[in-house]
Amino acid sequence: MPTSSRPPRRGAPIPALRFHWLTALYDPLIRTWGAAATMRAAVIDALDLAPGMRLLELGAGSGRLAIELKRQHPDVELCAVDTDHAILQIARRNAARAGVDIAFQHGDMTCPSELGTFDRVYSTMVFHHLQPAAKQQALTTACRALRPGGSFVVADFGRPRGLLQLALFGLIQQPLDGFRNTAPHRDGRFEHAVRSSFGQVRSAAVWKTAAGTLEMFVCKP
C-alpha cells in the first residue's frame, strides 16, 4: 500500500478527511456543507474583535475561517497554526487569492511557542481529530496563550441532542475520525474538559447537522 493511502500513525492527529491523499478534496467538499458558513459567522461574532487585537487559530485547515475573519476585520493580526503541511499549502493559496495577510504556520497546537500574547484564541472542527490526551493539552495551550482579559472560542462536535443525532454521529463521523478520538465528544467528556480548563465557560450555540450535533463554547481563564 502506498504511504499516502495509509491512515495516520497511532497518536497523530487525523487529517481533515482521514487520509492524507484526500486532503486536496477537503476544500471543495467543505464549501458544500451548509453548516460551515453558519459556524464561521457565529465564531467571528463570538470573538468580539477590535482593531489591533492579536489572534491565534488552532487548526487552520484550508483557511476559510481565517480569510473571512480578515476580510471583516483587516486591522487584526492573525496567526493560524496547523500540523498538516498539505492543508497549509491550500490555506496559503486561498489567502493569496483573497488578498488577505495571514501568518499560516506549521506547528503543534499542543505546544505553544508564544505564551500570554494573544487577545483571542479560537478553534473550529479540530478537537475531534485529536487523541484524548492531546485534546487536554490543546485546551491548556489555548488558555496559556491568552493575555489577561482574553477569550477562547471553540466550536466542534458536542453531545448528540437526541437519538437521531446520536445515530448520525455514530454512523458517519465516528468511523471517519476514529472512535477513540470522537468518543469524548459523544459522551460529554470533551465538554467537561473545556469547562475544567477555563474559569468561565458558556455554551453560545448548538447546531444539529447531518453528521451530529455541533456546539460552540466561549471561554475565559
Predicted feature locations:
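Conserved SAM-binding loop of SAM-dependent methyltransferases across substrates and taxa
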Residues: 62-73
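Conserved class I S-adenosyl-L-methionine
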Residues: 2-48
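A short acidic, Gly/Pro-enriched loop at the edge of an enzyme's catalytic core
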Residues: 113-121
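A short glycine-rich, Lys/Arg-flanked "PGG" loop and its adjoining helix->strand segment in the class I
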Residues: 136-148
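Conserved SAM/SAH-binding beta-strand->alpha-helix loop
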Residues: 84-86
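Conserved SAM-binding loop
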Residues: 91-92
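C-terminal alpha-helical "lid/dimerization" subdomain adjacent to the S-adenosyl-L-methionine
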Residues: 10-13, 155-211, 215
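Conserved SAM-binding strand-loop segment of SAM-dependent methyltransferases
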Residues: 98-110
